[in-house]
A protein has these predicted regions:
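Surface-exposed alpha-helical segments enriched in charged/polar residues
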Residues: 38, 66-69, 124, 144
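A mid-sequence interfacial segment
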Residues: 62, 66-96, 100
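Secondary-structure boundary motif
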Residues: 38, 42, 70-73, 93, ...
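Short, acidic loop-to-helix structural element flanking the phosphoryl-transfer center
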Residues: 44-78, 116, 159
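N-terminal helical cap/lid subdomain that shapes the substrate entry/recognition surface
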Residues: 1-62
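Asp-based, Mg2+/Mn2+-dependent phosphohydrolase catalytic module
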Residues: 84, 88-170
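Active-site phosphate/pyrophosphate- and oxyanion-stabilizing loops and adjacent acidic/basic residues
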Residues: 34, 69, 120
């Protein structure tokens, strides 16, 4: 099994998949990883190792976080993430949860992007109107959804171009 196959097990599989169910809080992240391990025919005792190897190449963009942190004195900064129930603890452990005035995690609110409700939750928490908000995401469907609400959308391709677009809007 190659990386793409494992990535499909971890993140893909459609709306009834283990990943999708974990993303809206129907199952926990731990239950999802146990499902992945079962599909890989690996023992549950190897979950931590497999998870750490899978995410081992991920890098937190500290420059991007510092830019967002620099906005906070004058602007509200929020995050909307289609993520499992462990994200908030991860953000706190890695010391960047404080960058955000609001963090909306799909597993916690039981709805995922591109559903309108998740954007509305974030807007309500930040106490801003859609036309006052800028949303950055890598998925075109999520950008289209935010724009339908009246938010400005920036499709993330790389940090440099996203920052350039964001600075132009702000």
């Amino acid at each position: 099994m190659d990386y793409e196959d494992i990535e499909k097990l971890v993140f893909g599989g459609g709306s009834n998949s283990s990943a999708a169910r974990a993303s809206v809080g129907e199952i926990t992240e731990q239950e999802h990883w146990l499902n992945v391990m079962k599909a890989l025919k690996l023992p549950a005792s190897d979950v931590a190792r497999v998870r750490d190897e899978f995410f081992g190449g991920d890098i937190i963009d500290r420059n991007l976080l510092e830019f967002m942190r620099s906005l906070k004195p004058k602007r509200k900064v929020g995050a909307i993430s289609n993520a499992w129930d462990g994200l908030r603890a991860y953000m706190e452990r890695e010391k960047f949860a404080d960058v955000f005035d609001s963090i909306v995690i799909s597993a916690e609110v039981k709805v995922a992007k591109p559903a309108e409700k998740i954007y509305r939750i974030a807007l309500d928490q930040l106490q801003v109107k859609p036309n006052e908000a800028v949303f950055v995401d890598d998925m075109p469907a999520n950008i289209e959804a935010c724009e339908r609400l009246g938010m400005k959308g920036i499709q993330f391709a790389d940090a440099e171009s996203a920052l350039k677009q964001l600075k132009a809007i702000l």
